[in-house]
């Protein structure tokens, strides 16, 4: 690769899953030939050994940093913290469970270079044949309904905004994330909405994905997220993303 990369991992009580995730990412980065690569683990107020596990991995990969949020502030807060601190020219945020294999970063990079985009959105919905392990019937269909309402509320064209695998050109990321208001799960829709509002080209890219047991988001809590696209629209009307 000809550009440098920061990989941001928001983590809350990920002591058990994080070691394997970091091993896979470190191995990938060593194979990739990046001129500079860093891993940023953003601890969101974990009460287990997440921070210790991440710091131990620094012995194997010195360009690994651990950022700590002031308490459990939410996934959106954690991703913003990492994006505003990263040093690479590109910045990927990936869920700590690696439900999308880290190798799919190559796919996002190719899409950005091919289409001249500043944001690449990993998508489960564009090609569902790439899903190895599906979510439950209930969760998958809740996701479809959410997407329809999200598109109605925001005008965004994407078929999947909630896949935790997105790549940003770092200068664009700083402009987007400094305007972000949502600290919880609704931040994905918000940052894509802000990017589109700023005129940044965003491309949706099909990626491999597998449902990994151990989600910290209940289906009913996810239902509350149906309000988020409407809050984004309301914030836009009020001029809060200027």
Predicted features by range, described:
Residues 37-40, 51-85:
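Conserved donor nucleotide-binding strand/loop of the catalytic core
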């Amino acid at each position: 690769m000809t550009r440098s990369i920061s990989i941001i991992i928001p983590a809350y009580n990920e002591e058990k899953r994080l070691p394997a995730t970091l091993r896979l990412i470190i191995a990938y980065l060593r194979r990739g030939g990046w001129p500079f690569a860093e891993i940023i683990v953003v601890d969101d107020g974990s009460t287990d050994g997440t921070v210790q596990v991440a710091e131990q991995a620094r012995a194997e990969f010195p360009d690994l940093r651990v950022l700590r949020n002031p308490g459990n502030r939410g996934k959106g807060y954690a991703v913003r913290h990492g994006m505003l601190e990263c040093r690479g020219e590109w910045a990927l945020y990936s869920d700590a469970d690696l439900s999308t294999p880290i190798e799919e970063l190559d796919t996002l990079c190719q899409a950005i270079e091919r289409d001249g985009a500043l944001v690449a959105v990993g998508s489960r919905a564009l090609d569902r044949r790439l899903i190895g392990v599906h979510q439950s019937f209930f969760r998958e269909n809740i996701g479809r309904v959410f997407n329809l309402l999200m598109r109605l509320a925001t005008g965004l064209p994407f078929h999947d905004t909630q896949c935790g695998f997105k790549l940003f050109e770092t200068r664009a990321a700083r402009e987007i994330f400094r305007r972000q208001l949502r600290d919880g799960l609704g931040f994905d829709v918000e940052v894509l909405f802000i990017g589109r509002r700023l005129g940044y080209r965003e491309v949706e890219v099909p990626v491999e994905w597998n449902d990994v047991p151990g989600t910290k988001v209940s289906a009913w809590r996810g239902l509350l997220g149906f309000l988020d696209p409407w809050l984004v629209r309301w914030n836009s009307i009020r001029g809060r993303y200027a």
